[in-house]
Curated annotation (Swiss-Prot):
Residue numbers spanned by region Disordered: 1-100
Protein name in the entry: Beta-amylase 8
Domain of life: Eukaryota
Subcellular locations according to the entry: Cytoplasm
Stored Pfam families: BES1_N (PF05687), Glyco_hydro_14 (PF01373)
Gene from which the chain derives: BAM8
Organism: Arabidopsis thaliana (Mouse-ear cress)
Length: 689
């Protein structure tokens, strides 16, 4: 004991500068050693950690944990020169982070598959514990909050609960009941002799009434029947009934369908082109029981020639026609240009006075690495820059929205206008203009970052300086061209620079610019439209989705690599403004080879985006990306809008149908469109499940 006291005294009180500043760790077995930073527990790990906090604090307070008493004194002996050890620890932390990101990437792929094909009610940020628990429950096990897992014990006088799932079976319930009774009669004696050796699941609730077997005294009372045949037959009966009930419940939902009116019905001077043709078009839509129509209100037309001079006369005439047919109306605040390979002869640019400003100051437009400008929409970096005749970008948007709200106040009061969609980027979607065909982009190219104008570069440099790394204040130089593939670039390739310190910094800043723009505009949209529903369109960027980097999503502004959920952060911002999300559903099924070449996964992307929105409590609507579809295309859209057997019964709040031309010119789609609308309304149901 005397020796031990001397040792402790020497250790805690020594101040000799000649001693080794890095003492031997074996001499101090109780010293706290640096460990890699642990991951924040989620799911069951979080519950277990919370349960263990109180005992741990008691142990500390009572001095029962080894090494607590000498911790302070021990730290004093190692205070000098540990620079090399610190660098090694930092390297080990980084290696641990890389291993963790790789593990999370594998987990995210497993979660996507389970959500898509297994109908498991997994949260968007589920971890492996949640996956194992869901699989265990599906197999009939019980899983407690602390992770304790066990088979259900015998519970007399309680009904056995079997997991329900949809099945495909040609057998009717009556046939299954007959099979069950036959199995019971043939196995009754052997089962009663051997019931103690069977599984511990209680089957007291399974009994046969005397009326089912007249004259047979054995069935005058309820008895435990543990026959395998009885179990399977009755479980099949329950599964069939549950599937029928759940399918009918899902099919009965009423999803409103809106038809998008063609773009060219309002000319560049703000006048209605063909009133009689529009009337005929609306008559066709009314005959199909369409709930309403969607019309683009183009900034480049209404405020096309002079700032703050708004021409609404053509839209007033159009809205009066829509009111005559008693159709609802959704309007789009279209702050982008229209035109391209699929637009025909219709071209709608940004306002002429904006283009004139752009000639003197081209940095008001998005710019790629080679200095080429995109005229699809205004640069988000000028949202708060007074470069538009004394107004900022968001002031221009707000003035336009406020003018519309004032001009058509009577339609809002009547309830004719049910929602307003806010255009937030290229094609009216919340995304960067990263895929311009006029600059050579070809599907499935990864696109290019749009941040090389002076305003964006100043923002990037300021952010880099605040981090203490001024040399990070520039865009990537090795991210390829518009039509490049991920593996062809240093930045997007497997374990490329996108996942380096600089890559994560840049991608976070790039995506935050998108989120910040959405927040700036939506805050003013809520002021302009008050209680009216606000809609924001989210793109479907499904190519390169099977790569680790998700390169196409990154250039479009969604920081969504395989080890990170980029959509939840966007939806958190949209949730603050009670926004309804409109998701552009992917196009028709492509050949497996085409998907493999594009590394595309439209189904996986759809499930991630839709479930991320639902997890945040957002309503979600849909829009088809194709112009005319057959019966198979209709079924795919219906399955997305009204998912079968969803545990929470979620479904789309509306659906917008885009058409290639007026219905009077595209009558070949008429029968399929009629079927599609009836299915969305729940008027007809698919009994083949």
């Amino acid at each position: 004991m005397h020796t031990l006291n001397n040792t402790i005294t020497t250790t805690t009180g020594s101040q000799d500068p000649n001693l080794d500043p890095i003492p031997d760790p074996d001499q101090f077995p109780n010293r706290n050693r640096n460990q890699p930073q642990s991951r924040r527990p989620r799911g069951f790990a979080a519950a277990a950690a919370a349960a263990s906090i109180a005992p741990t604090e008691n142990d500390v307070n009572n001095g029962n944990i080894a090494g607590i008493g000498g911790g302070e004194g021990s730290s004093g002996g190692g205070g000098g020169g540990g620079g090399k050890g610190k660098r090694e620890r930092e390297k080990e932390k980084e290696r641990t982070k890389l291993r963790e990101r790789h593990r999370r990437a594998i987990t995210s792929r497993m979660l996507a598959g389970l959500r898509q094909y297994g109908n498991f009610p997994l949260p968007a940020r589920a971890d492996m514990n949640d996956v194992i628990a869901a699989l265990a429950r599906e197999a009939g096990w019980s899983v407690e909050a602390d992770g304790t897992t066990y088979r259900q014990s015998q519970q007399p006088n309680h009904v056995v609960q079997f997991p329900t799932r949809s099945i495909e079976s040609p057998l009717s319930s009556s046939t299954l009941k007959n099979c069950a009774k036959a199995a019971i009669e043939s196995q009754q004696h052997s089962v009663l002799r051997n019931d103690e050796k069977l599984a511990p699941v209680s089957l007291d609730s399974i009994g046969i009434a005397e009326s089912d077997h007249p004259g047979n005294g054995r069935y005058t009372s309820v008895s435990p029947i543990t026959s395998v045949g009885c179990l399977e037959a009755n479980q099949l009966i329950q599964d069939v009934h549950s599937a029928e009930q759940c399918n009918d419940f899902t099919e009965s939902f009423y999803v409103p369908v809106y038809a998008m009116l063609p773009v060219g019905i309002i000319d560049n001077f703000g006048q209605l082109v063909d009133p009689e043709g529009v009337r005929q078009e609306l008559s066709y839509m009314k005959s199909l029981n369409v709930d309403g129509v969607v019309i683009d209100c183009w900034w480049g037309i209404v405020e096309g020639w002079n700032p703050q001079k708004y021409v609404w006369s053509g839209y007033r005439e159009l809205f009066n026609l829509i009111r005559d047919f008693k159709l609802k109306l959704q309007v789009v605040m279209a702050f982008h240009e229209y035109g391209g390979n699929a637009s025909g002869n219709v071209m709608i640019s940004l306002p002429q006075w904006v283009l004139k400003i752009g000639k003197d100051n081209p940095d008001i437009f998005f710019t790629d690495r080679e200095g080429r400008r995109s005229f699809e929409c205004l640069n988000w970096s000028i949202d708060k820059e007074r470069v538009l005749h004394g107004r900022t970008g968001i002031e221009v948007y707000f003035d336009f929205m406020r003018s519309f709200r004032s001009e058509f106040d009577d339609l809002f009061v009547e309830g004719l206008i049910t929602a307003v969609e806010i255009g937030l980027g290229a094609s009216g979607e919340l995304k960067y203009p990263s895929f311009p065909e006029r600059m050579g982009w070809i599907y499935p190219g990864i696109g290019e970052f749009q941040c090389y104008d002076k305003y964006s570069q100043l923002s990037l440099q300021k952010e880099a300086k605040s981090r203490g790394f001024t040399f990070w204040g520039k865009g990537p130089e090795n991210a390829g061209q518009y039509s490049s593939h991920p593996h062809e670039t240093v930045f997007f390739q497997e374990r490329g620079e996108y996942d380096s310190y600089y890559g994560r910094f840049f991608l976070n800043w790039y995506s935050q610019l998108l989120i910040g723009h959405a927040e700036n505009v939506l805050s003013l949209a809520n002021l302009a439209f008050e209680e009216t529903k606000i809609i924001v369109k989210i793109p479907a960027i499904y190519w390169s989705y099977k790569t680790a980097s998700h390169a196409a999503e990154l250039t479009a502004g969604y920081y969504n690599p395989s080890n990170r959920d980029g959509y939840s952060l966007v939806f958190e911002t949209l949730k603050k403004y009670s926004v309804t999300v409109k998701f552009v559903c992917p196009g028709p099924q492509m050949s497996p080879n085409a998907h493999e070449e594009a590394l595309a996964d439209p189904e996986g992307l759809s499930w991630q985006v839709i479930n991320a929105a639902w997890d945040k409590g957002l309503q979600i609507g849909g829009e088809n990306a194709i112009t005319c579809f057959d019966r198979d295309g209709c079924m795919r859209l219906i399955d997305i809008a009204k998912p079968r057997n969803h545990p929470d019964g979620y479904h789309f709040s509306f659906f917008t149908y885009r058409q290639p031309s007026p219905l009077v010119q595209g009558s070949t789609c008429f029968p399929d469109l009629d079927y599609f609308i009836k299915r969305m309304h729940g008027d007809i149901r698919d009994k083949q499940f």
